[in-house]
Amino acid sequence: KDINQKINSFLKKLKTKNKKEEISSIDISDKKKCFIIRIKDSRENYYFEELGATFFSYVRRFKNISSIDIYADSLNENKDKLIKHFSEFIFGFNLKGYTFDKYKTLNKEKLTKKIKNKIVTSHKKNIENNYKYYNAIKEGVFLTRDLVSEPPNVLNPKKYTEEIKKLSKLGLKIEILNEKKLKKLGMNSLLGVGQGSKNETFLVTIKWNGATKNFGKPLAFVGKG
């Protein structure tokens, strides 16, 4: 009851002052805060993802906060939109929380603060099922960031192939061609590029055959690592 009174009183003050800030906060107790997020009526693409990222940055400023409960039902929208927009919000929140702290030693806790979030909603199961799609993207983004952040003397071609092999558990078909196989295929131009390195040259193909029949023509990406 006291908490509701505090929040309602705070909301009235915000309305009276015509505050335009996206995020505001109020102290509930010595260890708890209530964050109020203002949702715009006019929204551009990726609005909720960006808002989630902004919210993470806002919350991270408070040293004593390591976890938060996020109430989705306060978003005044129909069920389908609420599920979609809240999933996007959590996606942005989690993406913003990424840090590559493997080699950090000084102020590591301060620089790599993690904040757990718990969804509080009557549509929890729907949101969790919908978020699986976003979580797969998030995991891919984090893996990519981890790999590109590694120094080249650590993530050499051999080590890189070992990391790629791990993706086979997701259903990807992975083939790794070493120098012997590349020579046999006559791929001498590729081998020539690697002659200046002490590390062995590899070529990796990754295939995903999970598309539906009506997807259209196959897609192929070619890149040099």
Q: Model-predicted segments: where are they?
A:
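Short amphipathic alpha-helical segment within the helicase RecA-like ATPase core
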Residues: 1-219, 224-225
